[in-house]
Amino acid sequence: MKVELNGVEVETTETGFLVNLEDWNEDIAKVIAAQEEIELTDKHWDVINYLRDEFINNKENQPNTRNMIKDIGKIWGEKIDSKSLFDLFPGNPSKQAGRIGGLPESR
């Protein structure tokens, strides 16, 4: 599989995750999100950037949905539940946001 942006193809796995983390940028994220029928809002970007920060700066940590609820709630300054994240990323928040964020597929 590949993602194309401005005539340049970026390689992905069979499940749509980027092969190389370094290939990611916000424009690639928008292309992947469009393929997933997601229009990115500031809240989407908060989740994507949180996951990227955890992976890049915290020993390749890929938080599960439970940890995401706790941490994203702190970022937003409000109590949230899993529905809040599934409303943003209906295909599974950690996997779908990770895919859009250019991260490897989580276990």
Q: Where in this protein do the model-derived segments appear?
A:
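N-terminal first-folded block
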Residues: 4-34
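Helix-rich interaction surfaces within compact, conserved domain-sized segments
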Residues: 12, 69-107
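Metallocofactor- and cofactor-centric catalytic cores in central/energy metabolism, strongly enriched
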Residues: 19, 29, 33-58, 65, ...
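Charged, low-complexity surface patches
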Residues: 22, 61, 86-87
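Short linear functional motifs in flexible/disordered or boundary regions
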Residues: 28, 59-60, 84, 97
